[in-house]
Amino acid sequence: MNINEIAKLAGVSRATVSRYLNQGYVSEEKKKIIRKVIEETGYQPSSQAQMLRTKKTKLVGVILPKIDSNTISREVAGISDILTKQGYQLILANTNNSTEEELKYLSLFRDNQVDGVIFIATILTKQHKDMLKEYRVPIVLLGQHLEGYPCIYQDDYKAAMSLTEELVKSGKKFGYITVTDKDEAVGRKRLSGVEEVLKKNRIELNSNCVKCGSFTLESGYEKTEELFNEYPDIDTLICATDTMAVGAVNWLKKNGYQIPMQVQVAGMGDSYLGKIVEPNLTTVHFFYKTSGKEAARMLIELMESENVPIHKEIKMGCKVVMRGSHRSI
């Protein structure tokens, strides 16, 4: 079955079928006829031929830091929902938080035939920024804010402030488990939000009460052990991610601490782990799936329109979710 046979069965010209296949103008009446013939015959247009005609591959590269992350899976689900409906196929590139792998895949997608790239970023180095300056493929950053580039990012500072404002109502001695400050969003912004609220409430956050973890359950467990061995009187523990907070809860329970009576614990991210740990984890909900959808929509605009401003940015909202791991007043 070829395009000429489809045209003959539909009673239209070959050019009309070609326009239909390439999203050109075709009257609604003829669209219905052509669609019906294609469905009945099971015709599949040659992707190679379409690519030669349109110079489009309908492929999008998605660079992600960690394939087993609940946050990333929600973002990718949102990306996929939008792009697959528009006929795009995704190529997922898992970097395991390696800068070298990220740069490798950015180069690979730039030099090979993808129509666009979504880069789920954690740490943006000088090398990343230098490459992005010369990037000739439409690209959207997801998860980090970079001035002058299309990006979707969370309001991490506000999220941390809003959460801490709830916890200071019943907490006096605070500990915090962060991640590397090379991560602008999760590392710096969230810690800054916590510190700002504590300062306003005249609560000291001793620098020794801030421990640096690495996004994992194990690091949450280990850093909580370090923290409470040094400061056993901490009554409020905030973690930069839910995963680390669940690790913290595990250590506290194992060592006889009553949650939330002795120690209230909170994370950020509203992951499934926080909903199954006992007590359920107080957290901040980020709209990760929605942010994935917004990134996909923005990329489609960049790929399909010549009039999209390159500085388009979207800062996502968030909401505090109070559960059983915090003390009620």
Which residues make up each language-model segment?
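Short hydrophobic/charged patches on amphipathic alpha-helices used for structural packing
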Residues: 49, 103-106, 129, 164, ...
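Short gly/ser/thr-rich secondary-structure transition/capping motifs
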Residues: 40-46, 100, 120-122, 221, ...
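Central regulatory/effector-binding core of bacterial HTH transcription factors
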Residues: 84-130
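N-terminal helix-turn-helix/winged-helix DNA-binding helices
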Residues: 39-77, 86-88, 96-98, 108-111
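Bacterial carbohydrate/catabolite-sensing allosteric modules
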Residues: 40, 81-86, 134-141, 145-329
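Short beta-strand segments enriched in small/hydrophobic residues
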Residues: 14-16, 52-68, 166, 173-181
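N-terminal helix-turn-helix DNA-binding module of bacterial transcription factors
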Residues: 1-58
